Amino acid sequence: MLVEPFENELLRSTEKYIHSHFENEGSGHDWWHIHRVRNMALKLAENEGGNLFLIEMAALLHDLDDWKLNSENESKTAKWLKNINVDNLQAESILEIVEQVSFKGAGVENNATTIEARIVQDADRLDAIGAIGVARTFAYGGHKSRPIYHPGIKPVLHTNFESYKNNTAPTINHFYEKLLLLKNSLNTATAIEIAKNRHIFMETFLKQFFAEWEGDK
């Protein structure tokens, strides 16, 4: 489904707003993360289908109310969609997609219910793995002043969102608590294929990391 001219205007306004909002963000959830997720979501949609306006808008807005970045009770996403006069039904769909994007713990069921939500979720998860994923993981760990690694603190597979949200473990644990699990949590065939090499890269990185940690290399 092609994007209508008036929808394209809404997208460009949103892009400008999101760029200014996230331009100086330093935790790995910056404008360039959003830019990559948007581009990947549109790439996935070429093979998987879906409403391109909903996909691109949700990709642009997916971190605006993320719990890691926004502690306010009021939804900035809903407020923005209202301000630019997005159709009510479309706004509801976009908010639903955004709500379903985030990883909430290894034991929490994936609730992406539409092709648009599955695509945006996959695009976001692909940006959490591979070389970019490694870089973003350490950026976030540094942002939160977390140690890189502690041999005495073992990874935990969180069975609920509260446990996952309150986790303060070393950064290396995040690979085992989330990143290495993402390959098998993807929804679309296109994303699953892209994830293969990114997953291998992380495994190679961890092997090298632990060899250097022990002084073997």
Predicted regions and their residues:
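His-Asp-centered metal-binding catalytic motifs of divalent-metal-dependent phosphohydrolases/nucleases
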Residues: 52-69, 77, 94-104
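Divalent metal-dependent phosphate-bond-processing catalytic cores, especially two-metal-ion Mg2+/Mn2+ enzymes
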Residues: 2-6, 22-31, 35-48, 61, ...
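N-terminal glycine-rich anion-binding loops that anchor highly charged ligand groups
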Residues: 13, 47-53
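An active-site-proximal "capping" alpha-helix that borders the catalytic cofactor pocket
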Residues: 37, 73-84
